[in-house]
Regions:
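Short acidic (Asp/Glu) and glycine-rich catalytic loops that position anionic groups and cofactors
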Residues: 24-25, 40-47, 54-61, 98-104, ...
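Short, conserved charged micro-motifs
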Residues: 56-60, 112-119, 222-226
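Short amphipathic alpha-helices in soluble, non-transmembrane regions
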Residues: 1-3, 117-125
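A structural supersecondary motif
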Residues: 30-35, 44-54, 69-111, 130-134
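Structured segments of extracytoplasmic/periplasmic soluble domains
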Residues: 70, 74, 83, 123-131, ...
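C-terminal regions of mature proteins
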Residues: 1-40, 45-51, 139-277
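Long, C-terminal catalytic modules of enzymes
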Residues: 95-102, 114, 118, 129, ...
Length: 277
């Protein structure tokens, strides 16, 4: 007979420090150049993350970010991959890290510089505003319903459901019905709401515009590519130069910036009581 003894000791809250996320200053584009670890890698890559500040109701904010990621995904891919053929990887979507949300755009290219890739993302985001505002009601509702159906889709594997619950546990939020809460907010969102959200967080003129651009340069030769128009290219570069802050020491940068509060854990204590497994 085999017996196993487990010795338990008391753990203090200080043993589990809450992760804190750097809050970017509004109105700035931060760029960070990551070193290329593979000397034979010809591709350059960039990730631009539009940080979404925590000022809306938690679930409404999540719903707006998810819906924007849904509607922008196909036009972004069509423009930069299909039409401009910028590279192997063209992706956009939402992100969430310890309660702080974002909208991300990722490009990987073996023929364009990271500066050019950054300019194309900024230009796309600016030009997409008019496309979003002119979207007809039927197309908007189709995108919204597709997102709702995806959110409410039952897990195909036990591991999917397990991972979803463990994600809430490891973050210490314990809101196991978060999908239903987000869907309830999605049903309320109108196109006008989404455009207002876009103006505030995605446009350079928005009051809550803040972006982090992480870049790495490949070792392959890059050709000089031309933008859609010289006028648009010049406008983008002018706005970039006046708002861009280069991060040279990432650790020093993190220690010099304000942090978001431990919002997700604090707000979810009251919700945890009503959450159902």
């Amino acid at each position: 007979m085999i017996s196993i003894q487990i010795h338990l000791s008391h753990r203090y809250a200080s043993d589990y420090p809450d992760p804190r996320i750097v809050r970017l200053d509004r109105g700035h584009l931060y760029t960070f150049e990551r070193p290329q670890v593979n000397k034979d890698q010809p591709c350059s890559a960039i990730q631009m993350m539009y940080q979404i500040d925590l000022e809306y109701d938690e679930w409404r904010l999540q719903a707006l970010v998810s819906l924007l990621a849904q509607v922008v995904q196909e036009p972004f891919y069509d423009k930069l991959r299909t039409k401009e053929q910028l590279g192997y990887l063209v992706w956009s979507g939402s992100s969430e890290m310890w309660g702080v949300l974002g909208v991300r755009f990722i490009l990987q290219s073996d023929k364009a510089t990271v500066e050019y890739l950054q300019q194309r993302i900024l230009t796309f985001v600016r030009n997409y505003r008019s496309i979003l505002a002119s979207m007809d009601k039927e197309k908007f509702e189709k995108n919204r319903e597709a997102l709702i159906a995806n959110k409410l889709q039952k897990p195909k594997k036990l591991s999917e459901e397990t991972n979803r619950y463990w994600n809430q546990i490891t973050k210490r939020t314990y809101v196991f019905d978060h999908r239903e809460l987000e869907v309830a907010e999605l049903r309320k969102i109108t196109l006008k709401d989404l455009v207002a959200f876009y103006d505030k967080f995605m446009m350079e003129s928005g009051s809550e515009w803040r972006v982090l651009s992480s870049r790495t340069t490949g070792n392959g030769s890059k050709v000089t590519l031309k933008a859609d128009s010289e006028k648009d290219d010049g406008e983008t570069k002018k706005q970039e130069s006046s708002r861009t802050i280069e991060i040279k020491d990432f650790e020093a940068f993190k220690h010099s910036m304000p942090l978001y509060p431990v919002r997700a854990y604090l707000k979810s204590k009251s919700a945890a009581a009503s959450a159902k497994l």
